[in-house]
Amino acid sequence: MKANGLDNDPARTGMERTDIDSEHPEAQPLLNNNHRTLGAGSANGPAVNEGRDIESDGFIKDSLFQIRKGYRIFIHNSKWILNILILINTIWLVTTLISDFFFNINILFGFSNRYASFNDLTLIFISIIANSFNLWFNKLGLYSALDYSLNVTLCVLTLFNLALTYLIKYTRQRIGFVGTFTYLWTSFSFFIGAILDWYLLFYNNSINEPLEERRIDDANISTFNENHTNSTENRDRSQYGSGSPTPTHRSQLVQNKHTLTEWVSIGFRNTIKFLILIFFALFTLNTLLTTLDTYRLTHKLPITVQSPSYEAFHYVDAAKTYQLHITCYGDVFDQENNTDLSENKKQPIILFEHGGYDTGYLSATWIEELYHLDKIQRYCLYDRPGYGLSDSPPAPISIAMVAESLRYALIKDAKIKGPFTTVGYDLGGLFTRVFTAKNVDIVDSMMLVESWHEELLLKNYIQRLLPPGRGDGDDGDDGNGNDGDGRNHDKTWLPSEIERHNEFRLWWKGIWSSLGWRLQTSWLLAHHGSKERIYGRDMKYQGRFLRSKFLESVTSSILSYRDVTNNAESLQNVKTSIVSSKEMVKKSALWGDWQRDLTKISHKTQEWKIVEGGHEIYKYGLGKQQTQEVLLRLIGELGKLTED
């Protein structure tokens, strides 16, 4: 009885089992039974299936291996593609730079862009930036949803700009294959960036998906065990009293976190892309404004010969390289009675050549006034290449090239035979001299109004044009127009046409002209119209105009200077009149000397008139009237001005 009682004693039985277990440890199970056990088994709850875990882990590892293998292939291939695109971009940038600004090599391939400006160069450069960023930031840890959105937006904006360009006939006919392809290529660069972002998102989700599924399964098992543990603990507490619970195992969530370096890289990339977005927003507004202005001025063109005025575009050669915008008033096609000695003899056609920073819209108003007063019968204006509505010329350009282009456009294409009285204002005086010299057979007389001297085409002309000071040094000024030797360097009296900017400054302005913010303020703040932006005061902010000024500046002291000097002898028998500004002559003795030299280019100089007012004589009432009288005397029609 006693033995049986001892055998049935739970405490003794536990002690004996403990002794046996300590003597034979290999008999112990690998994991003791515990309600928190996640291993081999638990007497108090369900156990995790080890076979399932091993199979699941193997599947995950195999999936991740395949995904990462595909990712490495994707990175390798994308680097090759992007490097090739950047190489093509760089070659294209250099080619465009040379072709648009120094020598037209596109003509070798039969391509032309009659709407060339700084836009193409800017778009190609942005394309290089986009492809470079695609290459540098094409990593799994650098994916950003914002970058994807920016790439898509920039791609659409670029295509929208191209659509605006193709919206109207004028720009659609002139942009050409090269200009169109530039827009498409830039859009393609942003499209590539969006595709790469999409692939990064795909691989990011593919890598995280199996881990996320495993996490969900582990979380479900953990939740089940936790619920079972809570019920067991509650039962233990009720049986053995309160105790401290053991922390439950939790699987860590697979999160898409970035390191500090990655955040800096993402922030830098997105900042640059955001700046590009701002640029494209301004670029789009500029394109929209230019499209509206151009449409307003060209949608009714050409105006046919049946109208009182004639306005059309004419090619400059048989190859149809580009077109000049020509406007005429009066019957310029009537060739009858040109040799008649009667009173009904037709006057010569006044052919006006505008200045360096204007068109006939501004500087020919004094001739327009004579026409409306019926003092002259007919006159023609044209915009030089890159000015107003005339096409952008191929590089290089010189005065003689423009003169030859004008002759073909007038005589061959427009069938305006002349004869002409050529009138040149400011820089246009040099173009008038060369055109007259090359066409003495169709030119009756020539008039130069505040004309440039050929010496102004040379690079160091400003130092010689400035009034002399008390010193002979030229060490730079102090910002107030004086240098250390007392020499006056105040250039404020110089007209903007004469104070020519150097090539770098023209280049810099041209690059920023793509934004068009000065053109935007012209209508937002100054309330200027379309003609002012295309022909008038705001034309100097147009990218096509700045490109033409750059081309003129590059060749001025080489080709253009030689054109003027080589054709000087042909002018000796041309009837000529000279008009000079009194203010300009008084401010610079050298300017007066140069004007005097102009009176000697012909043996048949009729008069040299110094009129009241400044360089822009058409703005001064008395000076304008005096200039009109000189023109009428030159063509033998002065009596009409004094008639009641």
Curated annotation (Swiss-Prot):
Modified residues (Phosphoserine): 22, 56, 63, 244
Start and end residues of each stretch annotated as Disordered: 1-35, 225-251, 469-492
UniProt xrefs under Pfam families: Abhydrolase_1, DUF2417
Topology versus the membrane: Multi-pass membrane protein
Bias (Polar residues) ranges: 239-251
TM regions (residue ranges): 91-111, 123-143, 148-168, 175-195, 272-292
Lineage: superkingdom: Eukaryota
Compartments where found: Vacuole membrane
CC terms in the record's Gene Ontology section: fungal-type vacuole; fungal-type vacuole membrane
Domain AB hydrolase-1: 348-619
Keyword field: Membrane, Phosphoprotein, Transmembrane, Transmembrane helix, Vacuole
InterPro entries to which the protein is assigned, alphabetical: AB_hydrolase_1 (IPR000073), AB_hydrolase_fold (IPR029058), DUF2417 (IPR019431), Meta-cleavage_hydrolase (IPR052370)
Predominant place of localization: membrane
Cytoplasmic topological domain: 1-90, 144-147, 196-271
GO MF annotation terms: catalytic activity
Ranges of compositional bias, category Basic and acidic residues: 14-26
Residues on Vacuolar side: 112-122, 169-174, 293-644
Entry protein name: Uncharacterized vacuolar membrane protein YNL115C
Annotated organism of origin: Saccharomyces cerevisiae (strain ATCC 204508 / S288c) (Baker's yeast)
Lineage: Eukaryota, Fungi, Dikarya, Ascomycota, Saccharomycotina
